[in-house]
Amino acid sequence: RKETELRLQRLAMSDPLTGLANRAHFVAAVTQATASSGDRGLVAILLLDLDEFKRINDTAGHDAGDALLQTVAERLRGALRPGDLIARMGGDEFAVLLTRLPDAEALQPILMRITDQLHAPFSHAGRPLECRASIGVALYPDHGADDVALFKHADIALYHAKNNGRGRAILFQPHLLDSWERETAMLDRARHILSHEQPCPWYQPKISLQDGGIIGFEALFRCPVADGSIIMPGDIARAFEHPELGPALTERMVERVIDDCARWRSKGLAVGHV
């Protein structure tokens, strides 16, 4: 009976596909490590996201995706020290807990081993596939007073790694938090616009250099709001690069431009190129 209980406990704390720790196990371990670190060195958490994993699943199939996840797990085991905890947090997200680090510089060789291992060639069923990862790193107590802050700051570092070239590791710095908060505010504002406001094009005439006549218009994004202010493109600049918000904003603007052009033409007005 005791063996059965231990087996069930192991199953509850591990990821069935890779055999790594699962999210619950990892979070509990981080909480314990930060609470008991004392003067025994720094604690670090690494959050890893596989680049282009969805594309691999879509083009090579889920069998290839599962094989890649298992390979990543093995490569992480080979790159890390005995006692380091590796977890699969879900999907293509992995995490590593490092303890007893003498200083921040001790991270560098570990990160180099991880990236070297993960970026090595990988193939499935004779088909070469790219295996690269973006990594966000945060140190305790330097980057957070508790495990909640540590996870948040590692996640922010990961966000910047993914949005600045991918395939790299970034250590959290305070300025990353400021940048993340600004970008998050832009995305939140864009979501509000799509749900509650009516963005509309403002038209700027294009003038012919030959005769000074109007040959068309440029449609400029503007969004008047109830308080009388106007949301400008720079206020939501990050949203235009977002994979979901960018196309949604573009579609909303294109619909308005098409409606305006149709109305002008119905009145016999020459629109030109917009």
Q: What is the predicted role of each segment?
A:
Residues L8, F26, V30-A33, F94, ...:
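Hydrophobic scaffolding residues in well-structured cytosolic catalytic/regulatory domains
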Residues V27-A60, A87, G216:
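Active-site-proximal structural segments of metal-dependent nucleotidyl cyclase/transferase enzymes
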Residues I86, R113, Q117, S123, ...:
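Cyclic nucleotide signaling catalytic output domains
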